[in-house]
Every structure is written in structure tokens, then in C-alpha cells.
Design a protein with these regions (language model features):
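Non-catalytic, mostly N-terminal accessory regions of nucleic-acid modification and defense proteins
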Residues: 1-145
């Protein structure tokens, strides 16, 4: 079933709630949009973006609760970026940054919750032509932060 914008916006807001306190609100978009992009390309599996082995959102889901989740998320994003000539584009947010995401169990819990939020979304369902999910998400975040 196609995702409703209200469901997308609710998930975006929920993910921002998880990030509160560790960083300036203007930086939320870096993390939220990166995860949304990873989820989107993993769900869509179209020919424009290659999702390499070890570079999918499902690989992130498998990390929930892992002590090294931040570093491993960075590596997963790096694999997708490298496979698609997107280095320096989608790999800017550091998911292992203790000053922004906390350390130890705090980081582990925060990132596990973030991944779980996006895991609930089905972005692969058919939508009407011209529906720009990523653009809508970006505009939503810009309006609120």
C-alpha cells in the first residue's frame, strides 16, 4: 500500500524527536534524510541506484542493538555511496559522532530507534506519477527546522 504523506511526516517528526538534545535542530536533516534515502533506494530497487551487498537498509536493520551500530551504519552508507559515485553526497552525516548522538548505550539505543522508525515505512509501494517522496520530506524538514 502506498505511504501517505501524513505517515511520512509523522515518521520524520518521530525521528527528529530521537535526535533532540545532542545537536542543533538544523542538523537533524543530515541524519534523517540520509536514512530516508537509504530506505527509499533499498525499497525501490530500481536501476538508477545500485544497492550493493552490505549496502542496504536491511543491513542497518540487522544492526539494531549492536554496540558498534554507528560505525557500521557509516560503512553501509559508504558502500552504497561508493557503488553509485555518491561519495561526499550521502555520506556526510557521521552516525558515529558521540558529540551529536551520545556514546555507548545512549548512541546504540538512539540509532536503533531511528532505524526502527524508518523500517516501519514501505517506500517501495507504487505511488502516483510525479509524487516526489524525498522532495516532500526535504521540504517538510526545511519548514520545521
Amino acid at each position: 500500500m502506498a505511504i501517505k504523506k501524513s505517515q511520512l511526516y509523522s515518521s520524520l517528526w518521530q525521528s527528529c524527536d530521537e535526535l533532540r538534545g545532542g545537536m542543533d535542530a538544523s542538523q537533524y536533516k543530515d541524519y534523517v534524510l540520509t536514512l530516508l534515502f537509504m530506505k527509499y533506494v533499498s525499497d525501490k530497487q530500481d536501476s538508477l541506484i545500485e544497492v550493493p551487498e552490505g549496502g542496504s537498509f536491511a543491513d542497518m536493520v540487522a544492526l539494531k542493538g549492536d554496540k558498534e551500530i554507528g560505525d557500521k551504519i557509516n560503512k553501509i552508507i559508504g558502500r552504497l555511496a561508493e557503488a553509485n559515485d555518491l561519495k561526499g553526497v550521502i555520506d556526510q552525516a557521521d552516525f558515529n559522532d558521540e558529540t551529536k548522538l551520545g556514546s555507548g548505550k545512549d548512541m546504540q539505543d538512539r540509532l536503533s530507534k531511528l532505524v526502527a522508525i524508518f523500517d516501519q515505512l514501505d517506500l517501495g509501494a507504487n505511488r502516483a506519477d510525479g509524487d516526489d517522496l524525498l522532495g516532500d520530506a526535504y521540504e517538510y524538514l526545511m519548514r520545521h527546522f
